Regions:
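Short, well-formed alpha-helical segments that are part of the catalytic scaffolds
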Residues: 20-34
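Conserved donor NDP-sugar-binding/catalytic core segment of glycosyltransferases
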Residues: 107-139
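A conserved acidic beta->alpha catalytic loop
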Residues: 47-56, 99
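Short beta-strand/loop segment that forms part of the nucleotide-sugar
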Residues: 39-50, 71-75
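Cell-envelope/extracellular polymer assembly enzymes that use nucleotide-activated donors
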Residues: 9-12, 42
C-alpha cells in the first residue's frame, strides 16, 4: 500500500474486470479521450477470475496510448478482491471506482478533480442506458433520493 504522503497529484481509477471483452473497449476509448492532463490520472485494471481476451485488449491500448498510465494486474475472483488489490497499488491523491461495462464523459476526471478536496467525497452522476435500444432507464440512485439525503446533485453546470 502506498503511504498517503507519497501519493502523486491526481486520480486513481480502479476498474475491476471480469470477462469484459465485449465492452471494455468503450471504457478504454472514454479514458483516452479525457480532457484532463493524462499525467493526472492512472487507470488500474484488475482482472478477477476467468480469463478471456480482456487483458489483450487492455495491453493493446497500453501500447497505442503510452501517454495514459494504464496498469494491468490480477486478483483472486470477486469484485471486492479486485477493488482491494487496486487500492493497494493506487498512488494518486484521490481514488474512484469504475465498472468495466461503464464509460465516462470526456470531462469526468477533470470535473471530479476540480471539486475534490481532502476529506470531501465527490459523487459523479450516471445513467443506465439500454445498449440495445439506447433508452435511458431510471438510475438506482435517483435525484429525489439524493436530494432527500441532503446531497447536492448538480454543483456545477455542464
Amino acid at each position: 500500500m502506498v503511504e498517503e504522503n507519497n501519493l502523486e497529484k491526481g486520480i486513481s481509477a480502479i476498474i475491476p474486470t471480469y470477462k469484459g471483452e465485449a465492452f471494455i473497449s468503450k471504457l478504454l476509448d472514454s479514458l483516452i479521450s479525457q480532457s484532463i492532463d493524462p499525467h493526472l490520472f492512472e487507470a488500474i485494471f484488475i482482472v478477477n477470475g476467468e480469463l478471456d481476451s480482456t487483458p489483450d485488449i487492455i495491453k493493446k491500448y497500453q501500447e497505442e496510448n503510452p501517454q495514459i498510465n494504464i496498469i494491468l494486474t490480477y486478483s483472486e475472483p470477486g469484485v471486492c478482491n479486485a477493488r482491494n488489490a487496486g487500492i493497494d497499488i493506487a498512488n494518486r491523491q484521490y481514488t474512484i471506482f469504475i465498472d468495466d461495462d461503464d464509460y465516462i464523459s470526456y470531462n469526468y476526471f477533470e470535473k471530479l478533480y476540480q471539486y475534490a478536496k481532502p476529506n470531501r467525497i465527490v459523487i459523479g452522476t450516471f445513467l443506465d442506458v439500454n445498449e440495445n435500444t439506447g433508452e435511458i432507464q431510471e438510475s438506482y440512485l435517483s435525484k429525489p433520493l439524493l436530494e432527500s439525503s441532503g446531497i447536492n446533485t448538480n454543483p456545477y453546470p455542464d
